[in-house]
């Protein structure tokens, strides 16, 4: 039709503009040498490439082809003071691209960057607020361990990652979802499995060219599965929320002390709409996944260093020997804190830190020009630097306890939740992990129960090597351990 005769020309202009935009971005990034020819090399040996890039380019910036956009520019750790608190470097936008934001089924990863999630954490999961939650968390930890690890006093084999994530999911859900859902099997199945399913779907999706993502995901079984999980999650949460809203309409003074209610309060305070299922799964991603990884790896490290078990048990007995939780109880488990921080130093969840997307052109003090929309990250190698840590590749459960006892500054920087340029386990600066206080609290609390109430050792021929994928370094999901119930006289 004559009225539509302009359409081919318009499409040609749009295509030409897109090609020119991509070409211009590539030209701006050409100043950074690319360390790998294909994204498969990044996916298979990301950490090795970082070491090679550091050696080949002598600490100067280089680029990793990740298969997404222009890849990631790896910067020298010396620029951390410039990047850590500069709003022109956005961690949320970096993660959104990595996790296929905008593709149906991955909405919880968009929720990770929403203001309402950060406000719910900031307003409710403060160190002071978390201390008040220890009693219900402890009660659920006790019940979850008994149900999942059993009270069998004979050695029996379990898949470590499977049992720990189920325990952490139940304990966290007490605070996230309250009594109605914290033991709901269908909901717990979703919270336990969603992240792994989404990660697998993302892996499959990344095999395709980026421009096909929005089409091909509809036909991939892995992507269909995560979409179905979100539908089910919404169906589970909706009636609980509707019931609560009716009850609160009848009695405005009614309060629920969980994240379902915190979101309702925050949404009214901020005058925004939100998707409860997306937000709850975002909380699960930020808390359950990282807590499970840290706890699983810590248990493996302790099993390889069994001389640590009894000193840890003695500390726990001295702190909560009377069975009473106090606001300072977990703060005083300083050896346990040190053990966890050492595990996080040796095996963080990623071999890079400070992943950011540049929201406008930036020129660093050393003259490095970072174009808008480029992705950047910093090699986390400082955590294994012999100039900073003595015998950095050797596990030392007392390392951070000694640093805390050595100086006032060490007390501030050597706690598990502390962030510093020398330890990027929880990030750094304005984008440091906001949920680290709750996550660390949950891990320490569950570990107190586990260490006092169970013996644990690695199964024969257990594989404890981390699972590496790109820059990710995850606790091995195939590791098997032997556990048995201990006869412990502390009742808490």
What feature does the model see in each segment?
Residues 237, 261-317, 343, 377, ...:
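Central I-helix of cytochrome P450 enzymes
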Residues 66-69, 77-177:
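Charged/polar low-complexity intrinsically disordered regions
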Residues 133-293:
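Cytochrome P450 heme-thiolate monooxygenase catalytic core
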Residues 378-413:
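Conserved cytochrome P450 K-helix/beta-meander segment immediately N-terminal to the heme-binding cysteine loop
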Residues 3-114, 422:
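N-terminal membrane-proximal hinge/A-helix region immediately C-terminal to the signal-anchor transmembrane segment
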Residues 42-51, 322-368, 378-383, 387:
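Conserved cytochrome P450 K-helix E-x-x-R motif and the immediately C-terminal K′/meander segment
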Residues 308, 418-419, 430, 436-473:
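Cytochrome P450 heme-binding "Cys pocket" and the immediately downstream C-terminal segment
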Residues 1-4, 15, 368-369, 471-492:
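C-terminal helix/juxtamembrane-tail motif
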